[in-house]
Amino acid sequence: MFDILVYLFENYYTPQACPAADVLAKRLAAAGFEHEDIDDALGWLYGLAETTERCVDLAQAPSSGIRIYTDSEYQQLGTESIGFIAFLESAGVLPAPLREIVIDRALAAPETPVSLAKTKIIALMVLWSQEAEIDNLVLEELLDDDGARRLH
């Protein structure tokens, strides 16, 4: 599923550039993706659209509150992902309403806990869905697969 999300980001400049779900499913199948993964990705994207629609008016509202995670959220997200979400928020990349969308979509992911690499893809897709301008350094970090980093 996550490979499909990255494929969509790389091939469609905005969500509006994506074709209708049935056409998109055919294109993804032609690109070699499995039908089960396509269904999962389309379902996940549908959930993203629903969540975004509910939160769109809140996206511009300033927030100075601190997010407290429930035990189940903490187990599903894991320490690394929660830390990364906090990093994006403190860097001004992820306003509080978009943070909530990232958390919602991470909780909808099939793995527990959600790996840091998958959390980065989720954050990328949430920002993409909002057509947010993403700084190049942030984009690099979001697309980094967390492989071994070379120290200089």
Curated annotation (Swiss-Prot):
InterPro entries: Smg (IPR007456). Signal peptide: none annotated. It holds the Pfam family DUF494. Belongs to the Smg family. This is Protein Smg homolog.
